[in-house]
């Protein structure tokens, strides 16, 4: 008899998110990229010990590298542990890298990681092509969110009456 294989549905598990990126940047486009990791880094990510805050990606010599990603050392490893803040290579298609190179150089856009997650057993990074917000833009978006919350509260009260 053959064993039933697990469904081929996309199995994803979120490791960490960069919520501050949505506040500080206007997200224009999103990409999914693989990431080159060491064994202890993957084990540490399975424990959920990562931080995307203040991380960004750069294109150098036709390759994309992620800087500032903090993956805490694996607790059960001995002397073979990894460096927590090392530069990690991202895996993208060549045509995507060319596109990103052009856009980041021309318009002054930034490559910001939004999420780090497991997809079918592999660690993936959701990268965003983003433009930095000015201070007044941030204030405006906060004001808009507060107004929407107030409207929702009023609607809820009317429904209850």
From Swiss-Prot:
Places the protein is found: Cytoplasm
GO BP of this protein: trans-translation
Organism (species): Syntrophobacter fumaroxidans (strain DSM 10017 / MPOB)
Annotated spans, Disordered: 139-161
Basic and acidic residues bias (residue ranges): 139-153
HAMAP family: SmpB
Pfam families xref list: SmpB
The name this protein goes by in its record: SsrA-binding protein
SUPFAM superfamilies xref list: Small protein B (SmpB)
Listed CDD domains: SmpB
